[in-house]
Amino acid sequence: MIQQRFEATLTARDCKRHLPHRFQVPAGCAQGEISLRFSPHRVGNTTNMLCLTVFDAHGFRGAGHRGGNEHIVRIAGDAATPGYEPGPLPAGEWVAQIDTHMIMPGEPVHYSLEITLREGPLAATPQPTPKARPSTNQGAGWYRGDLHSHTVHSDASQTIDELLQAARDYGLDFIFLTDHNTVSGLAEVEAKGDASLLTAGGVELTTFWGHALVLGGREWVDWRIRPGSDAIAQIAQQSYPHDLLF
């Protein structure tokens, strides 16, 4: 077992920053656990908000953009905390990034970030999920649906099954899953549609400066933009050639 710990104190000047914490994952690692804890959680009537984004040696591995002052992430070959992708843990440099969405003026925020890596037999990785067949209603007309929804993969309490059941109960024709800054639930939601309910994926770009939806894809979209840049316009322009909606 390998353990590593980071800790620091932040002030309001550190609000709206991406703080990378780099660590090495050795070959043969079967499970990783990343724990973020911080205090104080509340300042007056407002909460501080620190979230996690994880990158493995190949790129984006998941994110947990949700409330609370304790975030525990487990990633293994066969399972992962919602918001993160299961699968092999490639050897090399990983990054646990703390996204400081809100740090209130006044009392500083102290955080600790603990990394625990365990060796062992590699669990089988879930097979890619095929997309469900499209809805039988494909002609022009009026359709009832929802372009914006969340699950336990970000900051909602409902599972994907519960979301889809609610959509059917309300008589929707289609629904898009758009969790905050992660795509970990998209394969599942797309596979669970049927002829009566079209299910599709997307992502809500929950930036420090505003929110936007990218609909129709499975790939993660880098939401880390700088104020005053044209990054959002570039994301929109890059979406259209891939038949995505922005």
Which residues make up each language-model segment?
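Edge beta-strands of jelly-roll/beta-sandwich modules across compartments, strongly enriched
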Residues: 46, 104-117
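Surface-exposed beta-strand/loop patches in noncatalytic accessory domains
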Residues: 2-14, 38-81
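A metal-dependent hydrolase metal-coordination microenvironment
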Residues: 131, 135-246
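Surface-exposed loop/turn motifs at beta-strand-loop junctions within extracellular Ig-like
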Residues: 100-102, 117, 203
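Solvent-exposed, flexible loop/coil segments flanking beta-strands in beta-rich domains
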Residues: 1-42, 114-121, 128, 132-140
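Solvent-exposed strand-loop boundary residues in beta-sheet-rich modules
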Residues: 56-58, 119, 218
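Short structured motifs
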Residues: 18-21, 79-83
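Noncatalytic modules at the cell exterior or secretory-pathway interfaces
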Residues: 28-36, 85-110
